[in-house]
Regions:
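Residues forming the flavin
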Residues: 1-189, 193-199, 242-452
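Extended, charge-rich alpha-helical interface modules
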Residues: 188-239, 243
Length: 452
């Protein structure tokens, strides 16, 4: 990405949206709306001081909601450019509340709350659509209990947990454990605050809160308003300390997830949703299981699927190595349902077609390999650009020309065309770039003549 950002022949228009495409191959006029960041790209140094001081935490979409960011943020650390952006849906300044902390903090004077959208018009020879994809929402399959059982996560969420730059620093902390730790942290802050208030009263009356409260409950100080308030504060403190101590006992037994289950074809190869194979999921699950084993050698993984489609060069060897070196077990069969056992452990009920039996097994975490779905907004984009979609809402192409769309001069690559893995996406992107270069360097463009 850094090479792209520094390339003299590449202009990046990030945080932008294509509003109109007019013309024909070799002579397109593209209208782009550059959305207001409320941060000047030329002035912002990407130091992050504004985000550090911002008082508004927001669920972090890049980490799939498993962590938090601030209302002023950079999408991720390696993003190009490193300019920050203000999220107006959460920023206190845009919600009618007084704040402006980021503006006061920024030494480069880059924050500008008055910034507006800009319209940019481009003259281009060709257009390449590389809109990517979205993942299938597994909550549409109720038997998998996604978002009901905390330790059932998607493959993308698990990817962020494995990442050293993710919300857990690469440690496989279970979501249920992290939720309890967050709750415990909140209670500890409340307890510390109430303890501070009680300490002042103890110094004032020269008596411990516990000793005073025992006397108070026995009828002493009945009409003393100051001591009544002391008793109320002590009761509030006890109401915090009791659940806090219970959570501390639970947290003592926390450990990283070591028993993992990967469920394949969640939403794909399923006529209720997407009948096609998503292509990359099998190898992605194997890769995640291997990395999890590298993080914690005691980890065991079970991959449930109708079959494992290892179709690329070296893929079958990679699959076998995962089984022999990374404690991966491959189970041929479909998962019927997931229930919640003790300690928030998911219990998977499945059919093993080789053993010809239905059985259940408990795991620390379940990872759902979700289908590759057409990206949100692809229908509107297709209308704007003027290309056709197939029956699944991927960009329609010809089998003999897999990067050419229905409109000459407009090309497509990657998962905007169909589900595919990274090597295939790169190969198709190279093909689309070559086709676009033909138009860019062609002096005379032949136009089709109308035939009566």
């Amino acid at each position: 990405m850094l090479d792209v950002g520094r390339h003299p022949n590449i202009e990046l228009l990030v945080y932008s949206e294509v509003e109109k495409v007019e013309g024909e191959a070799g002579e397109f006029k593209v209208t782009v709306r550059r959305r207001a960041r409320y941060v000047d790209e030329d002035k912002c140094t990407g130091c992050g001081a504004c985000a550090e001081k911002c008082p508004t935490p927001v669920p972090d979409a890049f980490n799939e909601g498993l962590g938090s960011r601030k209302a002023i943020y950079s999408l991720f650390a390696q993003g190009i450019p490193s300019t920050h952006t203000i999220d107006t849906d959460y920023c206190r300044q845009f919600q009618g509340k007084k704040c402006g902390v980021c503006q006061k903090t920024c030494q480069a004077d880059a924050v500008n709350f008055e910034q507006e959208d800009r319209i940019v018009e481009l003259q281009v020879a060709a257009v390449i659509i590389a809109a990517g994809y979205d993942v299938f929402d597994p909550s549409l399959i109720p038997e998998y209990r996604y978002q009901e059982i905390p330790n059932v996560v998607t493959a993308i969420e698990f990817e962020r947990l494995l990442s050293a730059s993710g919300p857990t620093g690469g440690h496989l902390d279970r979501p249920s454990d992290r939720a309890i730790e967050a709750q415990l942290e909140g209670l500890e802050k409340k307890a510390k605050k109430s303890q501070k208030a009680l300490k002042k009263l103890e110094e004032k009356f020269d008596e411990t809160s516990a000793a005073f409260y025992k006397k108070f409950k026995n009828g002493a100080y009945g009409e003393d308003e100051d001591r009544q308030k002391w008793a109320e504060k002590y009761e509030d403190h006890l109401a915090v300390v009791k659940p806090m101590n219970e959570l501390k006992k639970q947290a003592e037994g926390f450990d990283v997830a070591k028993r993992l289950a990967f469920i394949q074809c969640v939403g794909s190869r399923d006529f209720r949703f997407y009948p096609f194979c998503s292509g990359y999921c099998c190898m992605h699950s194997i890769k995640e299981a291997i990395i999890a084993h590298e993080h914690e050698p005691e980890t065991t993984s079970t991959i449930f699927g109708m079959d494992i489609r290892a179709v690329g060069k070296g893929f079958e060897e990679y699959k076998i190595r995962g089984g022999s070196h990374s404690n991966i077990t491959y189970v041929r069969g479909r998962v019927a349902e997931i229930t919640e056992g003790s300690n928030h452990n998911p219990v998977v009920t499945y059919e093993d077609t080789r053993a010809r039996e239905v059985t259940s097994q408990e795991f620390d975490m379940v990872i759902l390999a979700t289908a590759c779905a057409p990206t949100k907004g692809i229908v509107e984009l297709a209308k704007t650009v003027g290309v056709e979609l197939d029956s699944y809402n991927f960009i329609k192409t010809s089998p003999l020309s897999p990067v050419d769309t229905s409109t000459p001069g407009i090309f497509v690559c990657g998962c905007a065309e169909s589900p595919m893995d990274v090597p295939e996406s790169v190969a198709q992107a190279s093909s689309a770039a070559e086709r676009a270069a033909e138009l860019a360097f062609q002096s005379d463009i032949e136009k089709e003549k109308a035939v009566a």
